[in-house]
Amino acid sequence: MEQIDKQKIADAVKVILEAVGENPEREGLIDTPMRVARMYEEVFAGLKKDPSVHFDTIFEEQHEELVLVKDIRFSSMCEHHLVPFFGVAHVAYLPQNGRVAGLSKLARVVDDVSRRPQLQERITTTVAEIMMDKLKPLGVMVIMEAEHMCMTIRGVNKPGTKTITSAVRGAFKNDDKLRSEVLALIKHN
């Protein structure tokens, strides 16, 4: 995949600084354009990755009960305003035929999908779809809670508000008791 063009980003940041009336050559700002370019390379690293590869290795285990990894911290950039949003993801699945993934792989998929210009709704759906496709579980449930800086520092200016999204597939969609179990475990400390 094509590398991020850091010089092009730095040049654009310099233009933005000039457009808002700043002097990009003054002390404190002189290195800012390249700093921003390096930051974008890091926060958009998911653009260069295929998150589904984390499920290339599947383990056969005699476990067909709920698996939940909760409070996976993530951050992303709102594709509408290019400001951060961040929070936690809770990822649950119900293995089928003993097919389980390494627990860290769930967090890695969340990271790779998040690290690009993105919408929270799309992250939630994409993580669920990748898991259904690669793990072939009986069901998947992904819940994400995040604070969006586009609502906190601009526009409605509502710090502390959280957006919660969910993607519910398979057994979790059809079984209220199973879905309630996941929600109760997420709330449990």
From Swiss-Prot:
The pathway is: Cofactor biosynthesis; 7,8-dihydroneopterin triphosphate biosynthesis; 7,8-dihydroneopterin triphosphate from GTP: step 1/1
Q: Provide one Gene Ontology biological process annotation.
A: tetrahydrobiopterin biosynthetic process
- In the Enzyme Commission scheme, what number(s) does this protein have? 3.5.4.16
Q: Does the keyword Lyase apply?
A: no
Q: Which GO terms describe its cellular component?
A: cytoplasm
* Gene3D superfamilies in alphabetical order: 1.10.286.10, 3.30.1130.10
Q: What class of enzyme is it?
A: hydrolase
Q: What HAMAP family does the record tag this protein with?
A: FolE (MF_00223)
Its name, as the record gives it, is: GTP cyclohydrolase 1
Protein's organism: Listeria innocua serovar 6a (strain ATCC BAA-680 / CLIP 11262)
